[in-house]
Amino acid sequence: MSATSRTPLRSNRSRATLLAATAAAAALTLSACSSGGTSGGGGDTNFVMGKDGISTVTKGERTAAPDLSGKTIDGNALDVASFKGKVVVLNLWGSWCAPCRAEAPNLEKVYQDLKAKDVQFVGINTRDAQVANARAFEKQYGVSFPSLYDPTGKLMLRFKKGTLNPQAIPSTLVLDRQGKIAARSLAALSEDKLRTMIDPVLAEK
C-alpha cells in the first residue's frame, strides 16, 4: 500500500474517533436534567437496579472509578483518588438544571451529617460555560463540599461503557473505600434515598 493510499485511512480513523466522542457528549446532553433513567451502558450484568431506581454492585464485582482530577470551581487542585479509604459520594450537576437545584439542600444536609464518619462528597459541575454561575449556585444553596469544574463534560467520558457510568444530570455515584463504584442514581435524590445509597457501603468492612 502506498503512502498516498494510507493517508485517507488515517484521516478516516481520526474522524471516526472524533465522531464517537461527540456522540457520547451529545448523549449526556440529551439526558440532562432528567428526573429518572435506566440502568445499562454497554450491557453490564454485574449490577442490580432496585425499585427505588438505585443501581448497586456487590463488593467483589465492582469497577474502579476513572481518574477524576482537575481544578475545582474555586480554582484548587483536587484528585478524587486522594480520598481512598473514605466512602466518596460523587454528584454530577449543573447550575442550569432544575432537579439539581431541588436536591442540593439534601446533599448538603447528608454531607454535614456524615463528613465526620469518613464520607467525602465531591461534586462535578458540568455544562456551565461560566464558572461564576457554578459559584453562585453553591452560594445560593449553601453547598460546602468541593466540586470539580468540568464545563465540557470530559470527566464523564472517562467512565467505561458497561460500568455504572453517569448517564443523566443529575447523577450520583457512591464509591467504596477502595475507590470502586458501588451504587448509582440517575435522578434527583431525597435525603432518605441518598442515605439508602451510602449506608450499606459505609457499613462494609
Language model features with spans:
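Short active-site neighborhood of thiol/selenol oxidoreductases, capturing the structured segment around
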Residues: 78-101, 107, 121
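N-terminal targeting signals for export/organelle localization
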Residues: 1-67, 205
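A short beta-strand-turn-helix
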Residues: 62, 67-88
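Structural microenvironment flanking redox-active thiols in thiol-disulfide oxidoreductases
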Residues: 101-141, 153-158
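Thiol/disulfide oxidoreductase modules built on the thioredoxin-like
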Residues: 136-143, 150-203
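Active-site-proximal beta-strand/loop segments in catalytic clefts of secreted hydrolases
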Residues: 92-94, 124-127, 150-151, 186-187
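Short, conserved catalytic or interaction motifs in soluble domains
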Residues: 32-35, 102, 177
